[in-house]
From Swiss-Prot:
One of its GO terms (molecular function) is ATP hydrolysis activity. GO terms for cellular component: HslUV protease complex. Keywords: ATP-binding, Chaperone, Metal-binding, Nucleotide-binding, Zinc. This is ATP-dependent Clp protease ATP-binding subunit ClpX. SMART domains: AAA, ClpB_D2-small, zf-C4_ClpX. Component of the ClpX-ClpP complex. Forms a hexameric ring that, in the presence of ATP, binds to fourteen ClpP subunits assembled into a disk-like structure with a central cavity, resembling the structure of eukaryotic proteasomes. It holds the Pfam family ClpB_D2-small. ATP-dependent specificity component of the Clp protease. It directs the protease to specific substrates. Can perform chaperone functions in the absence of ClpP.
Amino acid sequence: MTDTRNGEDSGKLLYCSFCGKSQHEVRKLIAGPSVFICDECVDLCNDIIREEVQEAQAESSAHKLPSPKEISGILDQYVIGQERAKKVLAVAVYNHYKRLNQRDKKGDEVELGKSNILLIGPTGSGKTLLAETLARLLNVPFTIADATTLTEAGYVGEDVENIIQKLLQKCDYDVEKAQMGIVYIDEIDKISRKSDNPSITRDVSGEGVQQALLKLIEGTVASVPPQGGRKHPQQEFLQVDTRNILFICGGAFSGLEKVIQNRSTKGGIGFGAEVRSKEEGKKVGESLREVEPDDLVKFGLIPEFVGRLPVLATLDELDEAALMQILTEPKNALTKQYAKLFEMESVDLEFRSDALKAVARKALERKTGARGLRSILEGVLLDTMYEIPSKKDVSKVVIDESVIEGTSQPLMIYENSEPQAKAAPDA
């Protein structure tokens, strides 16, 4: 096989045997026995082979379903704590995909039902991260929907069918793949009924959305336009069966612990209410573990909706020790991410242990859980990340407690010189 370029070997104009382009239209033309192929066709062939190999690998991994212990072990690498929630999720997801693998077998009279999942936990406790990690582990399409943007059909806002459309977009509109996917609906507590009493005004973003989600979560054939939603009614609709899509709903359910405490506190009114102070001493996570379906109904979810989410997992509030672990231990820990950013500038980044404690304390004060850690670090490192690319002689940056508290600037160590630190700006 020879490389032919610009007609150097002969005066005859040569063409690619596959796409028909001449040797002047391509960068390179490779000659074989009586055939020619251009560099563009070679690239195309490589892409086709790569896609087919990836699909084959995805299929083989889909048949190899990890055990609940293996699923929980992989979740441990990304999510700190929340052991019970991991166990509940691992078993539920394992049973769900085991059910899908068995559904085509003939002669089995027992039909296995779908078990959708409800995650309850304070903000920043890891609900979304758990769902994302599960989808990545199982190599299935995954999408996140925000319940607060959903409205009933016919009103301004997103239809519930838009959730399935987003899932289709994640897998290039492959309906078969989408039907095996995972949908995470966040802020599900925000669509609770505004009141226990019936109202003459229509609650289009609360109970109305719950009613619209019922069939979708339980299993129905949703008609989804390839693009544009309501704006292009003339488009041909795709039919997506949601019976095998796993729905995970998550929410902070602020105030649910009070509903639980009111139920579990027996007797005692007036002078007999001493029991309540004991109950109020419980952490939110401890109270949430005692949640029952009736508590969710009192909170504002309709009974039919609660019934469609039989698997319930509660997450605990993160304490200072857990937040410190989150900063350093997971595969994608924040300190590792920022260290990588600094490494790209050939600078080492070091966090002292007292700095990590200070960051964890600040996040606890803000009550934002793990989600608040990034914003704290971003604020602390902003000036340093602004300056470092312009300084070629910095070899290391050290962050201690005083930097987190704002009383001093990060310590910069320069090559072949003594450590230097800028004075804190005057307040």
